[in-house]
Structure formats: C-alpha cells, structure tokens
Amino acid sequence: MRPMRIFVNDDRHVMAKHSSVYPTQEELEAVQNMVSHTERALKAVSDWIDEQEKGSSEQAESDNMDVPPEDDSKEGAGEQKTEHMTRTLRGVMRVGLVAKGLLLKGDLDLELVLLCKEKPTTALLDKVADNLAIQLAAVTEDKYEILQSVDDAAIVIKNTKEPPLSLTIHLTSPVVREEMEKVLAGETLSVNDPPDVLDRQKCLAALASLRHAKWFQARANGLKSCVIVIRVLRDLCTRVPTWGPLRGWPLELLCEKSIGTANRPMGAGEALRRVLECLASGIVMPDGSGIYDPCEKEATDAIGHLDRQQREDITQSAQHALRLAAFGQLHKVLGMDPLPSKMPKKPKNENPVDYTVQIPPSTTYAITPMKRPMEEDGEEKSPSKKKKKIQKKEEKAEPPQAMNALMRLNQLKPGLQYKLVSQTGPVHAPIFTMSVEVDGNSFEASGPSKKTAKLHVAVKVLQDMGLPTGAEGRDSSKGEDSAEETEAKPAVVAPAPVVEAVSTPSAAFPSDATAEQGPILTKHGKNPVMELNEKRRGLKYELISETGGSHDKRFVMEVEVDGQKFQGAGSNKKVAKAYAALAALEKLFPDTPLALDANKKKRAPVPVRGGPKFAAKPHNPGFGMGGPMHNEVPPPPNLRGRGRGGSIRGRGRGRGFGGANHGGYMNAGAGYGSYGYGGNSATAGYSQFYSNGGHSGNASGGGGGGGGGSSGYGSYYQGDNYNSPVPPKHAGKKQPHGGQQKPSYGSGYQSHQGQQQSYNQSPYSNYGPPQGKQKGYNHGQGSYSYSNSYNSPGGGGGSDYNYESKFNYSGSGGRSGGNSYGSGGASYNPGSHGGYGGGSGGGSSYQGKQGGYSQSNYNSPGSGQNYSGPPSSYQSSQGGYGRNADHSMNYQYR
C-alpha cells in the first residue's frame, strides 16, 4: 500500500471534483423547504383523516402522530406505540438521495415514503392528494402542483419556481411485506384485498427504499470519505454510460463494502482508488462474488440485473481508470483539468461546509434523541483521561520542528549537486565522504551514511556563509532541559552529555537527526552498554522521562554505576541507554585499554613473539603471486575480530588465531590462509612463509606453532576443541636459527584482493606461548613431528570423518633447512626446526568442516630454496580456508 502522502494529490483532485458537483446552498435550501413543507402538510392530512375516522372526541391524540425517526431500525413500524396503531397514516419518512445526503447539482427528484396502517388503495391515495393541496396552501405561500400516479402508487408534487423540483410520495404499508412472506411460507390468507389496492411491487419497492435509507445512515454515513466518493462516482455514472447500470443502490453497497473493509480511515483519493481496485478485481463479473444485499432476508445479489456484457464493460472501465490513476492522471477519470502542483492558500472559512449532512433532519415533530448527550464537564470523569486530554493539547501547541541545515541550504541554493567522494571503513561501519560545490567553493564532510554526510556538508556551507545551521536553537533548548533535570535531581553526579554536534562533522557521535544512521560505539569500537557491562555486571537502566509526540519521541535513561548516576537521551530507549553507558564509561573509565579491561577471565597477557627474547627481523617485500606483502606495518592494536581469534588470546576453535584483520577469518591477502598457518596469520607458528630471506620453519623451533597462549596439538575436530597434553620440554638449549636462506620465488598461495595487506613480521604476527614455553618440544636432536590428516570433503550437511595420526619421530639430522610439508594445515618439519606439527596452537586447521586438502611449502634442505606445491586444494561445496577457495567463501560461520 502506498504511503498516505502520495495520495495527497489524488485527494485534491477528488475534493475539487466533489466541490464542483456539490449542490449550491440555494439549491439545498430549496430542497429543504419543499421537503419540510410537504412533511408538515402530510402531518396535517393525517390529523384530518384521523379526525374524520374517530370523531372530534379523540382530537387530542392528533399531537401524538409520530414521524418515524430516520435511524429507526425497522420499516417504520418498530417505534410505533399502541395508541398509534389505529391511525390510517402512521408517518412519513425521507428516502433516496434526500435521506442519504447524496444530492448533486441538477438532482431534481426527491422522495418520501408515507406509511399506511393497511394496504394503500386508490381511494386513500385520492383522499390524501386532495387534502394535501389544502394543507400545503395552509402551511406555505409557495405554489405547488399535485399529481396522482396510481400506477406508481405515488403522489407527485412539483414546485412552480426554479429549480423545478419534483417530490414523489410513495404510499406503502408493512402489511404488504408481511402477507408476501406468509404466501411464500405456504400459509393461506384469510383476509381478501380490496379491489382498488395499489400495485404490490411498487409498495414493496417503497419498503425496500426505506430499509436502504436506514442501512445507509447506520453504515455508510459514519465512514470517512464514503459519502464523498459515492457522490463523485454518481457523477461518473452520469457522464460515462458504461457505469450507468451501477447507479443507485449497487454503487452505494460497493463503496461501503470497499471503504468499510479497510483497516484505517482513508482520504477521498485513497478511498476512490480502493473502490476502483475492488471493481477492477472482477467483483461484478459473472464468476465474481457479486454484491450481497444486506437489506434482504434471502441472499440477494444487488447487481443481479446486469447482463454479462455490462459486467465486463464496467470491469474493463474500472481497470482503465485505475491505470490512469496509477500514472497520476486521475483528473481524466474525474473529467476535470489537472490541478496545479502548488496548492493555493485557501482563505480561512469561518463556516466550513459539512459535506456529510446536506439536509438537516425533520423538525416537524419533536423526536427524543436515542442517546444521552455526552457530559463534557462531569465530575465523574477519571483524572487520567483529563490528564491525557491536557497532554494532547500541549503536544498540539508545540511549535513545528525547525529546518535542518540541509533543508535550509536547499532553500537558499536550490539544485545543488552532492557527489560521493569516497567510501571507507568496514562494511558494518562505513564512512561516506560527500562534497558539494557552492559559488565556486568546494566543501567536503564525512558521516556514517550519505544522508548524514550531506547534512554535515550543508552545515559547513552554512557556517562558511555565516548563516544559522538549524542546530543552535535545538542545542540550547536541550541544554536548558538538561539543566532543569540536574536541578531537579541533585543526586545526579554526572549527567550524560547528549552529543548533538551537527555543526561538527568530525564529532564522535552524530546528532539526533542522524544518530540512528550509524551505530553508537565507544573508542574501542564496542557497544557502550556491552562494554560497561563487562566492567560492572548487573546494572539497571531506568526510564526517567518520555516526551514528544508519537512521531518524535524523546527518551531519557539513567544508570547508576559505583554510586554515580549517568543519563542519556535519544529517540528510543536503546539509543538513550547507549548514551548513558557512554557517559559512564567516559567518566569512570576514561583511559582504560580494552584488552586489560575485560574481567571475564583474569589471565596474564601472553607476551608477543618477536619481543625482547625473539627480536623480529625486518624482511624485504616478498614476491608471492598475490602481490607484495607489507611486512613492517603492524596491524592496528586492540581490534577485536568476530568469531575465532581475538586480541592477544583467542577463544574457541583456533585459539590465538587472527589475520591482519584480527578477525579470525582467512584474510584475502593471507599467505596460506589456514588456522595460524601461513604468512598472514597473526599466530603463524611454523612454516611461516617469508618470501625473501625468511626462514622456512619458525626460528629455533618456536613452540607449538605459535598458539596464542594455548599449547597442544590443537587438532581441529568437527564438534569441539581438542588440546592434547603438552609433551615434556626438551631440557637442552634452544636451537639456533637456521642459516640465511636465499629468496624464495615460490607461489605462496597469497590471493591478494583489493587493498588488503598481509603483515608477516609484525609485533602481532607471532603470538606464541609464554617465553618460558618457547623452547621446542623436541625429544631428540633432530626430532620432528609429523601430522597427517585424512579428510572427507564434507558435503552440505554430511558427516565429516577426520583421521589424524601424529608421529613423534626422532632423527639425527641437524638443521635440515626447515622442510615443510603442509597437510591440511599441519606442518611436517624435519630437522631442528620442528616443533610439534600443529601449525597453529589452537587449531591445526584440517579444514575438516569444509573438506579440503592443501599442500603447503616444501623447502629443500640443501639449497634453501622454497618450492611451493601445486595448488591442490580440493574444496567441498561449503568453501573453506583453502588457498583456492572463492574469496566470498573466506568466512566460515559456526
């Protein structure tokens, strides 16, 4: 369903058309005069007939003649009292266009129904018509012409002045319908009809019109826009012959059904479109549902009189009209000229036209209202309702929101072209830079979204022009509010600084207008509520206040930390909580580093490899096929990755594993891209691939594949983490480094993508065990460990079978140059360089879940050359960490 604002143009056209077809005040007054004169005259006729029948002694009862009220629930007989049952003329009721308020310009035919006690006869019709002329002359000076139409069971009154109105009085009686029902039920009638009884079908039609009028008043009059749409469609039925058969009762039922089934009130344009949609759907087609007549006891189709061709024509016409409306050409459907795009300001009309009620109800007879009038100032009204009313009035009295900087600039300089200069930052928190050129000067600003960046650019431009940016007034008012809150609550030690610096594009947090555009993060890149919860458990956030209307809410949340209270405000409770937590963090923990703040597990931080004991040597740029690896640029510290691995110590599978992106995922610029195995892994232990002059094995058998604080074989099983016991330490001294090796030009399987870099020799790239554990776990002088894995490529949802055999093999081979056979992330290191061949401390990634076999480097011990194996990565359908995996499959989710 379209937003409501799109229907505004349709509303204007429909209302303009409605105004053009709505009767003038003079026409309505003429109708009202004629109807009221006739009603009073008929009342006098009823009194006269009653006097003749009962004599002058019962004249006093004449005042009790009752016109059934228009909202009567039966056919005029339900409200009659016992003493009125003997009257020949029971009452008169308005029906048709007059009762429903559907009169248009040029509608000259009016209708009334005169209810009789018995079946109306020709004699009664003559008597009423004759006396009616006398009574009309007594009631008014206007001249009326009275005609008798026995065939139609009616009396026709015509006026002699403009407009030439014609009022038809239908004579009928409820007895006609009652007898018909008895006949249909098979009962025999004991009473014979008089010979001059009027046409039964005409009488039944008059009774039906009575039911239609009452149903319409009860159901359609209360629906917003329903009466307006019916009037507009009545005009359409007059102009377009195709729609003619729908005119009258079927059209009224259709409109009420379409508009009444909507889940909310609609404007005139939207309501008209809904009626057209209903017709276009084929409701009137021969195989359609039809339109049920609610005023008949038996199931009756109100459009049963239409033939097949008429039904198809109406449906096709409605579809065409709906198509025109969808393309903004509703004026063609309405038969009018298109309105200008800008609405002219209408002068305030002191007496707005009430389009629902055209003719006020009859005042000839005093009718007791059905409902008690609502007591406006009753004392029994609950105080909560009073409070709500006062609150609503206050909300309405609030001034409209001021323009923001972008709106203000567009008013001053319409048609400015904003250009996207760049987009930086990660996918989950991008930073957009927008620029705009104003009077030859170029302005740039950044923000978490294009919209925010444009707003910041506009602020810069307005500041440069020396104009207000639209944020000052709001900031000052917010400041006053916060000051009042501080005075009212002296216990608040540090109220949250609600940052709303629209005028400073580089502000830490955007303004209210843009706060929801990007996430609210601390300087460590975490959610403030989460970070505060890590430091202080069990904090409770309380809602202090909630202001503003439904479209512009303002929440203030408060949290108490260490006896101090902090507040935050925002457009929803989540944002307010975040700002409150942010205020607490800035006040109580201003300079605490993130890695040391975490109180989840108090463990000593693992020293970084390449520190004082293992000084990192600089390396030249490599020559891997993925492009140069930037070896001396450390990754940004303290960035937490999602999933496996983290800052300093890892969690779960692959502990201590993180690439240059510290995310625990295979970086696109990684050397091998498996768990801590290869050039770019932050925990690259053994077989770290140095492209130029590096050691094939990690120097001096660096312990355990550089597991981040966790030793063990770290075999990666499908279901859980497995750490086998640490072998006994070798008592001897650690082996010296291998000799200088020649540059290796082998393919290091570095798939380089975009701007990603691999940090092979940075302070963060070798997280090994603590220094005391960094001696190689070798049982002999030339010991090495051999890890072999047999992997079944795991199909989608299939079982994985991992078989791993590890051999601790003691050889006597001295330094052999660090030959490395990689099997699914494990390493085979003969010679003194071999630790135990897990490759990475927390998980020798066999790629068991993903099903892959990747063969890594083979380094010849004699020449020191680095021969890279062929890219034999057999990936399953699930992707994985193999070097040949698609870059889009680099992220493995658990």
Swiss-Prot record:
DZF domain boundaries: 5-378
Disordered as annotated region, ranges: 50-86, 363-401, 466-524, 625-660, 718-894
Residues modified to N6-acetyllysine: K100, K460
Annotated GO biological process: defense response to virus; negative regulation of DNA-templated transcription; negative regulation of translation; negative regulation of viral genome replication; positive regulation of DNA-templated transcription; protein phosphorylation; spliceosome-depend formation of circular RNA
Gene Ontology terms: cellular component: cytoplasm; cytosol; extracellular region; membrane; mitochondrion; nucleolus; nucleoplasm; nucleus
Bias type Polar residues, positions: 857-866
Domain DRBM stretches: 398-467, 524-590
Role according to the record: RNA-binding protein that plays an essential role in the biogenesis of circular RNAs (circRNAs) which are produced by back-splicing circularization of pre-mRNAs. Within the nucleus, promotes circRNAs processing by stabilizing the regulatory elements residing in the flanking introns of the circularized exons. Plays thereby a role in the back-splicing of a subset of circRNAs. As a consequence, participates in a wide range of transcriptional and post-transcriptional processes. Binds to poly-U elements and AU-rich elements (AREs) in the 3'-UTR of target mRNAs. (Microbial infection) Plays a positive role in HIV-1 virus production by binding to and thereby stabilizing HIV-1 RNA, together with ILF3.
Entry protein name: Interleukin enhancer-binding factor 3
Organism: Homo sapiens (Human)
Underlying gene: ILF3
